[in-house]
Amino acid sequence: MRKRWGAAALAAPLFMSLVGTAHAEPGPLDEYYTQTVAWAECPAGWVTPSTGVECATVIVPMDYKNPGNGNLEIAISRKKATDPARRRGVLLTNPGGPGGSGLGAVHWFNAQTDVLRVYDVIGMDPRGVGRSTQLRCISTPSDDAFPSRPTDAQLSNWSEYARSVEANCERGGGEMRRFVSTMNTARDMDVIRGALGEKKVSYVGYSYGTQLGAVFGSLFPKSLDRSVLDSALDPLKTWHEQDVDVVDAITDNLRKWTEWTAARNGTYGLGATPAAVRAELDAIAEKLKAGPHGGYADVTSFDYAVGATRYRRSWAAFSRHIASIKAGAGDPAEASAIVAALKKGDIEPTSAGTYQAVTCEWDWFTDVNTYYNDMKRWRDTQPYGGTVDYMAPTNCTFRAFKRPEKIPAITRKYPAGLVVNSDGDTQTPLANGRVMAEHLNVPLINVANDGQHGHYALRRNACVDALVNKYLVSGILPASRVTCAGTDIAENVPPGQAASMSVQSARPLSEILGEIAVETKPF
């Protein structure tokens, strides 16, 4: 989950005939549930080539209330269970977004051999995305140039931009746009279940995929077996309310870094208290308001660079970086590389305006002054890490279409699953995961002291992987609240140690962030 303006992508929808099988389900959707899934070698560009991975398409109605109003194609991928005698069904996956391509998710579980023995792992591009029938959205220039500390007069620029995004997506999306939604994607998942001949599916969803999984379970409780919601959203809050949680998490990570650095004043010389360390950042930012300083071209670049404090393993190098600027040794090439690495590790723009359609399911304030007041508050108190942009109006502030339906109340009438969240994740903060776990009355795995987003099968976290695998394979849940140590570990720099003695912090910050960016690419 991250506020992004999706890139334009154009593709004509494809349509196929439906063929019945023995897995019939009565009703007007019978032909969709009983279609034959023709697995074959994946077309070039769908997924990274790998032995045993197949692809197919499933046909779904654009509008489930009026199935005669046109069809959409949903692209799916499969890695079959390696031990057919022990096979217990399919494991459907979603990477989040909204709008993330999930065909390649079948590769994420390659190291989880126990899971691969018993499940067919299924990836999918949700409706509107990638190799499925794409939603059209006319391209809009990026908002990357917007300042991190806008003047009052500049606040309206966000509204103008958001209006243009909404207008372009509405023109490009046409009738299909109203039907690209969490609820319809959940219905597509149930059609996939039926078409595969399964009575139930198990599920692993990340980020927004946790909301999708919770909605799927609410709409189709008899169809859901085991479920893992990793980096969960808060099912009781609107998208904008969760943006507030994101800003709070960014601020909390910054605070923790100042505490860590203050405890090592003898190493970095940035102050013996968190307030003193924060004052060093403020001093750099103040100089940047007047012009280039410390290698940075402007204060906006520096503000976003401070967002690196979410990653614990970057703390030592970031402290060293700030100390070098304080000493007058700022390097423009390093500063540019830091910003580039953070952008590379950020979430890719989601496909074809899907994000801009799905997020409009939530209620949004329509009075722009509500956003402007929040933007000014964060600009004046804590602008580091891009907080102001999270508070800005979005295209949904100016939504041009009427929602066909609201998100249903999240309920659980299916077997208990798992929620996984970390206490440093800024995209889906731990507070969101706590609410999801409490609302569903399921166990929560807290990944401690870790700023990464998405954990199971992605971070080589033996504790998380073992607990989730045990549940998925054997149905054994952990205690209601479990803590696993994170893998995003701050370097052990004892107080008083000279910075030059630190092996990791001797590496450039940009190099460390570049490694993190590669690891983060699933999102």
Listing of model-derived features with the role each one plays in the protein:
Residues 413, 418-421:
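Short beta-strand/loop motif that positions the catalytic acidic residue
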Residues 2-9, 20-152, 275-277, 402-403, ...:
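Catalytic-loop region of hydrolases
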Residues 451-462:
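Catalytic histidine-centered segment of alpha/beta-hydrolase-like enzymes
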Residues 27, 276-414, 442, 457-459, ...:
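Alpha/beta-hydrolase fold active-site neighborhood
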Residues 136-147, 217-276, 308, 320-333, ...:
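A catalytic-pocket lid/entrance helix-loop region that shapes and gates access to the active site
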Residues 197-208:
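Alpha/beta-hydrolase fold nucleophile elbow
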Residues 134, 140-195:
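Active-site-proximal cap/loop segments of hydrolase catalytic domains
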Residues 426-431:
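Conserved alpha/beta-hydrolase "acid-adjacent" motif
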